[in-house]
Amino acid sequence: FKAYENVAQAMGGAMSTTGVPEGAPFVTGAQIGDSGTGLHLAIGLLAALHQANRTGQGQYVEVAMMDGVMNLCRVKFRDHQRLTRQELGEYSVPTYQGMGDVPRAGNDSGGGQLGNAIHCRPHGPNDWIYVVVQEAVWEALAKRIGPEVHHPDLATDPDLAKIADRRRHQAKMWGLLGKF
């Protein structure tokens, strides 16, 4: 059967994870269905060739674009499983244990880490960087940027010192990072 990228993204679950809260889902421009299907086909063909070399028997290899998309969405699917046990504190939108669906969360990182797109210098229309703020790097990052954003005590700011604090005060953290 023929497959179409945007339909595969919808059926494979990718669209349910993109977009902004309370808004329409988005298809990604990255063409994950086309590329993901090709990658999965290549893996299947290599496995079939290995089988043929070992046994002399060939195999029929079939891939579905929707399956390729689903595999590439595995982090969001893991977040869906995590929601059965806990809130997802890295999201900038509220989550709670047992809520069901992973929220469309704009540029939030998911997967347990705080992340977002930051408008950076010189603040032109295409001057963006994606930042993931892991616990292991926060102190060094805060000490580096703090003085430049007129917040020399950023590393020890009670709103931002610990990961739980940064989760509660993400808007403040992203705002300061955006000034850097």
Which residues does each predicted region cover?
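Aromatic-enriched alpha-helical interface/lid elements that frame and gate functional surfaces
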Residues: L114-F180
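Active-site-adjacent "lid/gating" segments in soluble enzymes
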Residues: F1-W128, V132, A140-K143
